[in-house]
């Protein structure tokens, strides 16, 4: 049964998540001036969202006569979506798409379902524009801004969705258009917001795993898998073994968030959601190398080694 209390939750994440702080407020200022605790900035209602589904990311469309059905989805988070629009000239003019509403509003008049929209666009026109842009409007006449406004949590950014268009020549010599979305789902790098040059620049400042020092201990995966408790919690990231045991009690989200990855290779989970700061902090937990498959762990002292000095939080969530 959910508990009923006289005051709002005092959980760490109630105050330090789901907030949209003013754009001049960075993490340091938010901490020093108590911005996290100002009730005006909590997210209760969500804003209008829309996106382009087709053309899909990296889809190639031959340059032929005819039209292409640009399609996507939108949601008003309770408010009815009344129109969806597409622009081929950076928002100078807009074309009205057809909107399909599935399902009925609730007894309270709320529209919680996604809607689907589409617009037939001449393929020849797609050749003359660098991108396709979409936006939606709800029944309160709210729409999406042209560009996003930075905030420290990166939340509620619902600016117009943009798909870039690149002329290409196919392997058989025909001309075509290839489409590029701003990003792609999951931890994989892709999309026009993560171009190769940006990735290379980011790689230059990425925290590299610590090199294996001479005589470093090595551990088999089977050994790591035995350390899954409050008394001993190990995990693997990028072939390195880390021990977060002393920090379980200090983690603001509780020990469970670390114990979920204890005893496993947490590379994907860790790298997908953690910041550069968190990756620097991770180095303090390093205790040895993961032995390659078929390789015996070092036969040296097997006493559980302790990590370096405490740094304030267990595997930090950023």
Swiss-Prot record:
Enzyme Commission number(s): 1.7.1.1
One GO term (biological process): sulfur compound metabolic process
One Pfam family in the UniProt entry: Cyt-b5
GO molecular function: heme binding; molybdenum ion binding; molybdopterin cofactor binding; nitrate reductase (NADH) activity; sulfite oxidase activity
Cofactor note: Binds 1 FAD per subunit. Binds 1 heme group per subunit.
Chain residues that bind heme: 251, 274
The protein's required cofactors: FAD; heme; Mo-molybdopterin
Claim: Heme is one of the keywords in the record: yes
SUPFAM superfamilies: Cytochrome b5-like heme/steroid binding domain, E set domains
Keywords: FAD, Flavoprotein, Heme, Iron, Metal-binding, Molybdenum, NAD, Nitrate assimilation, Oxidoreductase
Entry-linked PROSITE patterns: CYTOCHROME_B5_1, CYTOCHROME_B5_2
SMART domains documented for this protein: Cyt-b5
Described purpose of this protein according to its UniProt entry: Nitrate reductase is a key enzyme involved in the first step of nitrate assimilation in plants, fungi and bacteria.
Name of the protein this chain belongs to: Nitrate reductase [NADH]
Top-level taxonomy: Eukaryota, Viridiplantae, Chlorophyta, core chlorophytes, Trebouxiophyceae
């Amino acid at each position: 049964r959910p508990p009923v209390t006289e005051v709002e939750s005092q959980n760490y994440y109630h105050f330090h998540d789901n907030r949209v702080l003013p754009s001049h407020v960075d993490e340091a200022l938010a901490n020093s001036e108590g911005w996290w605790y100002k009730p005006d900035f909590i997210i209760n209602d969500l804003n209008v969202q829309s996106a382009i589904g087709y053309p899909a990311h990296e889809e190639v469309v031959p340059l032929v006569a005819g039209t292409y059905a640009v399609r996507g989805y939108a949601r008003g988070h309770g408010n009815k979506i009344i129109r969806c629009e597409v622009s081929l000239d950076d928002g100078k003019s807009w074309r009205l798409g057809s909107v399909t509403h599935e399902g009925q509003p609730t007894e309270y008049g709320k529209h919680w379902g996604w809607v689907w929209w589409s617009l037939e666009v001449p393929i020849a026109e797609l050749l003359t524009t660098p991108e396709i842009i979409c936006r939606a409007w709800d029944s309160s006449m709210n729409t999406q801004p042209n560009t996003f406004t930075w905030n420290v949590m990166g939340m509620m950014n619902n600016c117009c969705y943009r798909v870039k268009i690149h002329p290409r020549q196919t392997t058989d010599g025909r001309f075509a258009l290839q489409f590029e979305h701003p990003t792609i789902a999951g931890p994989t790098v892709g999309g026009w917001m993560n171009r190769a040059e940006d990735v290379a620049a980011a790689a230059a400042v990425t925290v590299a795993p610590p090199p294996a020092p001479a005589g470093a201990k090595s551990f088999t995966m089977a050994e790591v898998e035995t350390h899954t408790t409050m008394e001993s919690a190990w995990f693997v990231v990028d072939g390195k073994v880390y021990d977060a045991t002393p920090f379980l009690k200090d983690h603001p989200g509780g020990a469970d968030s670390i114990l979920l990855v204890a005893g496993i290779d947490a590379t994907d989970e860790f790298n997908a959601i953690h910041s550069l700061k968190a990756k620097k902090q991770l180095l303090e937990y390093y205790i040895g190398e993961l032995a390659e498959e078929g390789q015996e762990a070092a036969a040296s002292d097997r006493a559980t080694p302790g990590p370096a000095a405490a740094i304030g939080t267990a595997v930090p969530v950023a």
